[in-house]
Design a protein with these regions (language model features):
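A charged N-terminal "starter" segment
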Residues: 2-136
Length: 137
């Protein structure tokens, strides 16, 4: 019985951005928003015309400098808005491609995250798609 050979782990000096990207499988969960930057830090890409990026380590260091108590929650509204648009457009495309004679309305289960800022952002982003809230149990 043979076992697959695992790739030798690189030393810290040999570690690359690609190594981090593969190890943490960022391509499967983070694209197009999250990536490992040239410094080897987790970074966030805003989907604006300027191509703004934010180094998460820089954000954490700035919060520490300001005396903010940890843990903290970092919320990137561009990500929420873009994902609402992405899901709704995917359903619209599938409905059109299948010549389905009805519509789809996204419903956000409020028990997932009740924070006012999150719910407002999701509802605002979902307004063009008729998105609503599910408040049941």
């Amino acid at each position: 019985m043979s076992t697959p050979q695992s790739k030798a782990k690189p030393s810290a000096a040999e570690w690359t951005v690609q190594d981090a990207t593969e190890l943490y499988r960022i391509g499967s969960w983070g694209e197009p928003f999250f990536f490992v930057n040239a410094n080897g830090h987790m970074a966030v890409r805003a989907l604006d015309e300027a191509g703004t990026t934010m180094d998460v380590v820089d954000i954490v260091n700035e919060l520490r400098r300001r005396g903010v108590q940890f843990p903290v929650l970092l919320r990137f509204q561009d990500v929420l808005r873009a994902q609402v648009r992405r899901v709704n457009e995917a359903f619209r495309t599938a409905i059109a491609d299948a010549n389905y004679g009805n519509i789809s309305r996204g419903i956000y289960p409020i028990k997932v995250n009740q924070l006012h800022e999150v719910v407002d952002e999701l509802l605002d982003a979902g307004r063009p798609f008729g998105m609503g809230l599910e408040c049941g149990s």
